[in-house]
């Protein structure tokens, strides 16, 4: 089981926008190498994200399914990586001031061999992986916020 937190310099709506775009998952979820398809109803409960994980030629095809969602607040997934197992991943978004978000990610294997061999080494690896996952998520959400930041570029304004 691993829980990590990161303060992202973007409002919850901006972070959620990244979560709600299933096609971005290979950009920020460590280990996901390719998104094969995203159900049109993503991120509604029951919607699936079809992905590849791991290095080629050993990559595995699987799916992740939305269990619960509260727009701009949380997303819970059942993430598959069979034959290794299946995890529950819960991402929560808490406002931190006017333009920041505390993102928490909790992941726990619930089935398969990775569930059976719970130990400190697995927890440490999962913890480090999820720190990097949230760093990548922050990069995307913060970049989107900077691109949308209002600027006054009217003629005669100082640059």
Map each language-model feature to its residues.
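Intrinsic-disorder/low-complexity, polar/charged segments enriched in Ser/Thr/Lys/Arg/Asp/Glu/Gln
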Residues: 1-7, 13, 48, 61, ...
């Amino acid at each position: 089981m691993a829980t990590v937190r990161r303060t992202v310099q973007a409002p919850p709506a901006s972070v959620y926008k990244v979560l709600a775009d299933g096609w971005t998952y290979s950009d920020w979820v460590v280990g996901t190498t390719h998104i094969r398809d995203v159900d049109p109803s993503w991120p509604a409960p029951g919607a699936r994200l079809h992905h590849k994980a791991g290095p080629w030629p050993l990559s595995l095809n699987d799916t992740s399914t939305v269990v619960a969602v509260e727009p701009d607040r949380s997303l819970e997934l059942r993430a598959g990586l069979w034959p290794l197992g299946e995890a529950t991943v819960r991402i929560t978004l808490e406002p931190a001031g006017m333009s920041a978000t505390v993102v928490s990610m909790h992941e726990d294997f619930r089935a398969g061999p990775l569930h059976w061999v719970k130990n400190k080494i697995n927890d440490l690896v999962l913890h480090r992986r999820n720190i990097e996952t949230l760093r990548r998520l922050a990069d995307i959400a913060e970049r989107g916020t900077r691109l949308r930041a209002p600027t006054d570029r009217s003629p005669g304004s100082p640059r």
